[in-house]
């Protein structure tokens, strides 16, 4: 499992983040999957909202995880991803799309640009988020 952390300059808002996640997953449907391994065989479900397929009652050897998992606390946004199912470049593009969608809902008139691993406001030049 790889991990990318984005640190914002202000506390995150749940509703804006939910909007950003929906927009980002709609733009990148190949990351909107869930992997289920059952006794050594892995299958994928295309939508993480959908219920998993029927499995045996004894789930002693099952594991279920999303290809991209997002969690946040205050100013930190952590994105954990499966190294085997996607590349770091795909997830980095997903994080940039998520930040853009989040900021378009949170501050609709803010224009931003990406400078390396920083997202910067064009007018004030202040750092909106840093990506590690």
Where in this protein do the model-derived segments appear?
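Short, positively charged and aromatic/hydrophobic N-terminal segments
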Residues: 3, 7, 13-14
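Short linear proline/tyrosine/threonine-rich motifs used for host-factor recruitment
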Residues: 36-38, 62, 79, 113, ...
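A short, structured beta-strand/loop element
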Residues: 64-71
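Intrinsically disordered, low-complexity proline/glycine-rich segments
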Residues: 68, 127-129
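A short, exposed loop/beta-hairpin motif centered on an aromatic-Gly-Thr core
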Residues: 77-86
């Amino acid at each position: 499992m790889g991990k990318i952390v984005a640190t914002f300059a202000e506390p995150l808002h749940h509703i804006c983040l939910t909007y950003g996640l929906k927009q980002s997953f709609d733009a990148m449907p190949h990351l909107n999957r869930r992997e289920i391994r059952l006794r050594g065989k892995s299958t994928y479900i295309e939508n993480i909202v959908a219920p998993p397929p029927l499995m045996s009652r004894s789930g002693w050897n099952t594991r279920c995880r999303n290809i991209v998992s997002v969690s946040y606390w205050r100013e930190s946004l952590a994105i954990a991803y499966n190294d085997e199912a996607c590349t770091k470049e795909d997830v980095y593009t997903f994080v940039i799309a998520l930040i853009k969608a989040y900021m378009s809902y949170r501050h609709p008139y803010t224009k931003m640009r990406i400078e390396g691993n920083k997202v910067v406001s064009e007018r004030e030049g202040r750092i909106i988020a840093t990506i590690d």
